[in-house]
């Protein structure tokens, strides 16, 4: 019983400190309305458990992020939540989205599976740290399968997609099985050029609603 209580308290502390990631412990204590002594004690326990890394600021380890993803998955299942929100800022991509979305193999599959013809390009969004647990949660879901294909010269990998909405634009988040993007960058496709329709520029903060 004591072990179960300790585990629950550790997870509760992890959730709290994840919300102030990047801050020094003293500043985090103020934000969380905790005493400095209590905050340092909790951080010490989380570091010993492997959930936080050593250093001058609060920083989750991969183990800590994985634990949050499990908590999130269980909460979403319990509350029967049908969508999640991803928040980030518009960034310039690598230029690959236009090429891949113009390929007939992907275009036809997206028309078939998602019901729209994609604009030849993707909107790249660099996620805020608070959205990374949601992003990793998507990794564990099947999503909508966009099959890979070959054109006789090259093989193109499969893509996992989730229907999504950005402001008034309906589209999809796409997660290629092969990508050069870091985990904190997500790609959004739509039947229109989203930057033009919504008047977006690099650095603009956006919110994506992703349907599960």
UniProtKB/Swiss-Prot annotation:
Binds 1 Mg(2+) ion per subunit. Pfam families: CTP-dep_RFKase (PF01982). CDP binds at residues 93-98, 192-195. Its EC number is 2.7.1.161. Its cofactor is Mg(2+). One of its GO terms (biological process) is FMN biosynthetic process. InterPro entries: RibK_CTP-dep, Riboflavin_kinase_archaeal, Riboflavin_kinase_CTP-dep, Riboflavin_kinase_dom_sf, WH_DNA-bd_sf. Keywords: Flavoprotein, FMN, Kinase, Magnesium, Metal-binding, Nucleotide-binding, Transferase. Residues 1-83 are annotated as: Unknown. The keyword Metal-binding applies. GO terms for molecular function: magnesium ion binding; nucleotide binding; riboflavin kinase activity. It catalyses: riboflavin + CTP = CDP + FMN + H(+). Residues 84-212 are annotated as: Riboflavin kinase. FMN binds at residues 179, 187. Disulfide bonds: none annotated. Mg(2+) binds at residues 122, 124. Pathway: Cofactor biosynthesis; FMN biosynthesis; FMN from riboflavin (CTP route): step 1/1. Belongs to the archaeal riboflavin kinase family. Catalyzes the CTP-dependent phosphorylation of riboflavin (vitamin B2) to form flavin mononucleotide (FMN). This is Riboflavin kinase. It comes from Pyrobaculum calidifontis (strain DSM 21063 / JCM 11548 / VA1). The gene is ribK.
């Amino acid at each position: 019983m004591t072990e179960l209580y300790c585990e629950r308290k550790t997870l509760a502390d992890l959730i709290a400190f994840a919300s102030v990631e990047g801050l020094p412990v003293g500043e985090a204590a103020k934000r969380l309305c905790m005493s400095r002594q209590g905050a340092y004690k909790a951080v010490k326990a989380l570091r010993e458990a492997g959930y936080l890394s050593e250093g001058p600021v609060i920083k989750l380890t991969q183990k800590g992020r994985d634990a949050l993803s499990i908590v999130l998955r269980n909460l979403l299942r319990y509350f029967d939540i049908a969508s999640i929100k991803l928040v980030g800022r518009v960034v310039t991509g690598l230029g690959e989205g236009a090429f891949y979305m113009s390929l007939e193999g992907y275009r036809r599959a997206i028309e078939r599976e998602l019901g729209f013809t994609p604009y030849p390009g993707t909107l790249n969004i660099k996620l805020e740290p608070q959205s990374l647990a949601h992003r990793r949660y998507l990794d564990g879901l099947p999503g909508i399968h966009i099959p890979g294909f070959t054109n006789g010269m090259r093989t193109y990998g499969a893509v996992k997609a989730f229907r999504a909405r950005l402001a008034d634009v309906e589209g999809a988040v796409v997660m290629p099985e092969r990508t050069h993007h870091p985990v904190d960058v997500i790609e959004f496709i739509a039947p229109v050029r989203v930057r033009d329709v919504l008047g977006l520029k690099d650095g603009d903060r956006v919110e994506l609603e992703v349907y599960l």
